[in-house]
Regions:
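Membrane-topology segments of multi-pass transport proteins
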Residues: 1-76, 294
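Alpha-helical transmembrane segments of integral membrane proteins
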Residues: 73-294
Length: 294
């Protein structure tokens, strides 16, 4: 019978038996210096059925750390740099999708409430007030646990609980625009309410909507990272929050594994700041009143 002996440098039990720290690379400890090494095999072969033949084939060594870039590996031996790069795409996709859906819902609700007025405005604004009073994070945690862990579910939940602010902003702008002369002229010419909202009110609120769209993106990215850090994100997708969650769960915080902690944290901070600066710049360019105050 043929048997193969395999020693994996990522094996935690192997590190424990060799007295090596969880975050140390065994090759750096076992082969600390350059040069020739002698490998000694000790075995005790006994068989009641006859002689035993032992065959030793060429031994191969693979230095894992040399194959995984500057950020090293995590507890599973996975390349952290690759996870960080892939997580950038996921963060942008989640932030853009959730912000776009939220702005679409908020713009529609705010424009209808502001233009129609009366009981429609009252009902829609009371719904907005109720949702604003609800603590968002606990609700997201409960709903995320109920509907499953997937990127699509996270995007939908983030969008459904982040449109209320833009709805109020668009409503106030619509209340001002519907009293303008060009809107009154459109009403006098027999234009429908839908046509007036789409053709006259929406174009005049687009600068405000676009600026708020950009500012909604970092909020969605940070909220998704928080959910992933709490273990409510998709376990199959290496998001930045998932990287931080793995580092917390498997000792990265206690061992101060900076290559595991700092990159996703800095990525979240820098990307959020970038969108905040872009949003402020867009708001200053498209909003004359904001430019005058600045």
């Amino acid at each position: 019978r043929h048997a193969t002996a395999l020693a994996d440098a990522r094996d935690l039990d192997l590190k424990r038996r060799l007295g090596i720290s969880f975050f140390d690379e065994p090759t750096d400890v076992v082969f600390a210096e350059q040069g020739d090494y002698q490998l000694r095999l000790s075995f005790n072969a006994e068989s009641p059925n006859g002689p035993v033949a032992i065959e030793v084939k060429p031994v191969e060594f693979g230095v894992l750390g040399m194959l995984h870039g500057v950020l090293g590996v995590d507890h599973m031996g996975s390349d952290i740099w690759s996870q960080l790069v892939y997580g950038t795409r996921i963060a942008l996709a989640i932030g853009l999708s959730a912000a776009f859906i939220a702005v679409l819902i908020g713009t529609s609700v705010g424009m209808i409430a502001g233009y129609m007025g009366g009981i429609v405005d009252e009902v829609l604004m009371r719904i907005v007030d109720v949702l604003l009073a609800v603590p968002t994070m606990p609700i997201l945690i409960i709903l995320g646990a109920l509907f499953g862990k997937s990127v699509v579910n996270v995007v939908i939940l983030l969008a459904l609980f982040s449109w209320m602010g833009i709805a109020r902003i668009v409503r106030s702008q619509t209340l001002s625009l519907k009293e303008r002369t060009f809107v009154e002229s459109a009403k006098a010419s027999g234009a429908s309410s839908g046509y007036i909202m789409v053709s006259h009110i929406l174009p005049n609120t687009m600068p405000l909507i676009f600026a708020n769209l950009v500012l909604r993106i970092p909020s969605a990215i940070l909220t998704e990272a928080s959910l992933s850090f709490l273990g409510l994100g998709d376990p199959r997708v290496p998001t930045w929050g998932r990287i931080l969650q793995n580092s917390r769960q498997f000792g990265g915080f206690t061992k101060m594994a900076w290559w595991w902690l700092l990159p996703p944290g800095l990525a979240l901070t820098l990307l959020s700041l970038a969108f905040v600066f872009i949003g402020n710049a867009v708001n200053e360019i498209l909003n004359p009143r904001y430019r005058e105050r600045s």
